[in-house]
């Protein structure tokens, strides 16, 4: 059943496609796209000067991921980690937190595996900071693995310190 203005339209009266004048408001429930590869078509708003490949928003997802942390030299003996992601179309934003409870012999750079989606292009840059000392961090993603290092070419974190990082990339 569809209600338009003060009229109610039953399923048997609905033709495909449905064209309605004005805005559509859902007062309860969700708008569900029931077929893979379909979504919201923005082609009526074409305004880019480049070569367009798609104006269809067909994917949105958010969730959590579990960062698996090691070091490029030696080994970290204990850590806590938490990650979140948002995927809109082909664009993914990852954020994550790592707390080093015991660095062990870890040195070099921090390696983080387990990103939810593989990057289409290697070496997309990330940004982060050491929450404990304020040092800026950088790094990159290759596939689903990230490498984090300190701008000053120092090991990015020590026992008892935490880092927060973020990266946005294309899949």
Residue ranges and their predicted role:
Residues 1-66, 70-72, 95, 102:
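Intrinsic low-complexity, repeat-rich intrinsically disordered segments enriched
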Residues 25, 77-79, 133:
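Residues that act as N-cap/strand-start positions at coil-to-secondary-structure junctions
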Residues 92:
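Substrate-binding and catalytic surfaces of secreted/luminal carbohydrate-active proteins
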Residues 114-150:
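Extracellular attachment/recognition segments
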Residues 159-171:
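Short, structured beta-strand segments at or near domain termini in extracellular proteins/domains
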């Amino acid at each position: 059943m569809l209600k338009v203005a003060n009229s109610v339209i039953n399923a048997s009266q609905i033709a495909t496609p449905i064209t309605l004048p004005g805005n559509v408001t859902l007062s309860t429930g969700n708008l569900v796209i029931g077929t893979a590869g379909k979504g919201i078509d923005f082609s009526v708003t074409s305004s880019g000067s480049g070569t367009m490949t798609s104006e269809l928003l067909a994917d949105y997802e958010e969730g959590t991921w579990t960062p698996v942390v090691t070091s490029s030299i030696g080994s970290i003996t204990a850590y806590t980690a938490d990650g979140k992601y948002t995927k809109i179309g082909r664009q993914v934003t990852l954020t994550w937190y790592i707390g080093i409870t015991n660095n062990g012999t870890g040195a070099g750079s921090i390696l983080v595996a387990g990103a939810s989606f593989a990057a289409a292009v290697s070496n997309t840059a990330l940004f982060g900071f050491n929450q404990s000392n304020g040092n800026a961090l950088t790094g990159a993603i290759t596939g689903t693995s990230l490498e984090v290092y300190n701008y000053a070419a120092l090991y990015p974190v020590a026992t008892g310190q935490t880092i927060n990082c973020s990266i946005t990339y294309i899949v």
